[in-house]
């Protein structure tokens, strides 16, 4: 009897796996908007992929991965192939994830509403989509080595660079939303309390940035060397000061009354993180001490010796993973009314989301079964670009690939280590990020004929 009930329970999931409504999450949660639930499912699938990629790097997994035909053959370099199998496995797994999201991105170009037949693919058929993704990932493990890893290293670097910029855009959006929320509460009542909270958060961010700058100069520079690090730290410090001053200029405040130092402080902290991340990728070990050596432990060489495993888990990589998770899930649930950020992320403004969300009373809830269904709030128009969302997850897959492998590049004839290319990618992304933030401040003054409300 129990087995019959179990089969009946499993059968109730079939509409979720093959139907047009994403009820995978809704079975456990109250009914939600189709637009939000769908994005959360895609984000959770990417999170599962990240967890599997982390497992690939666990010591001992190379014995299982070596069983794949041709996966570790004809490799004669400084680093033994059995040490590199985790590195290669992450590349192939992330290649499969990236191709899955890229195909969906191309398929969803110019989808305008949920009435488009392609929207049913985006919002449903989960079993078939995930089965296709798994098939692509498995197939990626049988791609001949050749130049695959080298080519995909450069593709991953370009994609990770773009995703870092998207992280910055989402961070700008978060900072604006945070500031607006607290300013509104400050204006509604108990102004002293909220003003103190706003001031404390801003001061804390700037204090963290100042401490970071001091530590950078102490540990990542030397009087007679490390000139690149000195330049990176100094330039980014000056750029952050300039952006902070610009955010409170009278002209800027006149065009954007709610711009302020809180947003600038958040951008400053993120810029300091990118600066640190760039310096930790420098090939010269004297200008790139490990975190363990800084806190008092012995430093290990970037290039492993015979029989040693590669040190994958660096502090900046762990922080990078945390930022990645926050940004992906924030992009899945965000409903922003910041028009400049919405234009950059191809997302509708908050008013559209509210109007669509009100469609529940019009019978948009699925009738005729007891399964919780998502509310179709996109019948009149999508609330975000399906194509751009999948493209962002495509870039996120590449970012994860580079983060988990510490941006290392392996050349069989030589060794595996950090490259100056990775340093310049990260440091240039920090500069472009500050430029993007400054543009959100000055755009209303430059483009006076456009509405930025």
Swiss-Prot record:
Keyword Endoplasmic reticulum: yes
Lumenal side: 61-88, 145-151, 219-231, 281-309, 409-426
Highest taxon of source: Eukaryota
Entries under InterPro entries matching the protein: TDE1/TMS
Modified residues (Phosphoserine): 351, 361, 364
Modified residues (Phosphothreonine): 352
Keyword set, alphabetical order: Endoplasmic reticulum, Lipid biosynthesis, Lipid metabolism, Lipoprotein, Membrane, Myristate, Phospholipid biosynthesis, Phospholipid metabolism, Phosphoprotein, Transmembrane, Transmembrane helix
Transmembrane segments: 40-60, 89-109, 124-144, 152-172, 198-218, 232-252, 260-280, 310-330, 388-408, 427-447
Membrane topology: Multi-pass membrane protein
Subcellular location(s) of the protein: Endoplasmic reticulum membrane
Entry GO terms, CC: endoplasmic reticulum membrane
Lipid moiety-binding residues (N-myristoyl glycine): 2
A Pfam family: Serinc
BP-aspect Gene Ontology terms: phospholipid biosynthetic process
Cytoplasmic topology ranges: 2-39, 110-123, 173-197, 253-259, 331-387, 448-453
Cited PANTHER family: SERINE INCORPORATOR, SERINE INCORPORATOR 1
Family stated for the protein in its record: Belongs to the TDE1 family.
Assembly and binders: Interacts with SPTLC1.
Function according to Swiss-Prot or TrEMBL: Enhances the incorporation of serine into phosphatidylserine and sphingolipids.
Name of this protein: Serine incorporator 1
């Amino acid at each position: 009897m129990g087995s019959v009930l179990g089969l009946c329970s499993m059968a109730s999931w079939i509409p979720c796996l093959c139907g047009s409504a994403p009820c995978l999450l809704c079975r456990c949660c109250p009914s939600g908007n189709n637009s939000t639930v769908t994005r959360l499912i895609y984000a959770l699938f990417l999170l599962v992929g990240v967890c599997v990629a982390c497992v690939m790097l666990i010591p001992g997994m190379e014995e299982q991965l070596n069983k794949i035909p041709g996966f570790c053959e004809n490799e004669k370099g400084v680093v033994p192939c059995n040490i590199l199998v985790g590195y290669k496995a992450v590349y192939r797994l992330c290649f499969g994830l990236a191709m899955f999201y890229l195909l969906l991105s191309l398929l969803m170009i110019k989808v305008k509403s949920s009435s488009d037949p392609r929207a049913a693919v985006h919002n449903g058929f989960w079993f078939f989509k995930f089965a296709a993704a798994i098939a692509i990932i498995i197939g990626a493990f049988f791609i001949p080595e050749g130049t695959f890893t080298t080519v995909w290293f450069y593709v991953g670097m370009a994609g990770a660079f773009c995703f870092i910029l998207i992280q910055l855009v989402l961070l700008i959006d978060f900072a604006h939303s945070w500031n607006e929320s607290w300013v509104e509460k400050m204006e509604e009542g108990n102004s002293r309390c909220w003003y103190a909270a706003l001031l404390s958060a801003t001061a804390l961010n700037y204090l963290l940035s100042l401490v970071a700058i001091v530590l950078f100069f102490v540990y990542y520079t030397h009087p007679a060397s490390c000139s690149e690090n000195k330049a990176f730290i100094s330039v980014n410090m000056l750029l952050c000061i300039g952006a902070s001053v610009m955010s409170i200029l009278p002209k800027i405040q006149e065009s954007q009354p709610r711009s302020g130092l809180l947003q600038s402080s958040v951008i400053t902290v993120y810029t300091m993180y990118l600066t640190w991340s760039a310096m930790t990728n420098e090939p010269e070990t004297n200008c790139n001490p490990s975190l363990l050596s800084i806190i008092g432990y012995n430093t290990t060489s970037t290039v492993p010796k015979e029989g040693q495993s590669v040190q994958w888990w660096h502090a900046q990589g762990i922080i990078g993973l945390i930022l990645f998770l926050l940004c992906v899930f924030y992009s899945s649930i965000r409903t922003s009314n910041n028009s400049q950020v919405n234009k950059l992320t191809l997302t509708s403004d908050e008013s559209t989301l509210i109007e669509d969300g009100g469609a529940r009373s019009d019978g948009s809830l699925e009738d005729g079964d007891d399964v919780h269904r998502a509310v179709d709030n996109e019948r009149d128009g999508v609330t975000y670009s399906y194509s751009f969302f999948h493209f962002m997850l495509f870039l996120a897959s590449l970012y994860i690939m580079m983060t988990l492998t510490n941006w290392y590049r392996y050349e069989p004839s030589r060794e595996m280590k950090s490259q100056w290319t990775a340093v310049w990618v990260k440091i240039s992304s920090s500069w472009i990020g500050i430029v993007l933030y400054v543009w959100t401040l000055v755009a209303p003054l430059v483009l006076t004929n456009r509405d930025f409300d």
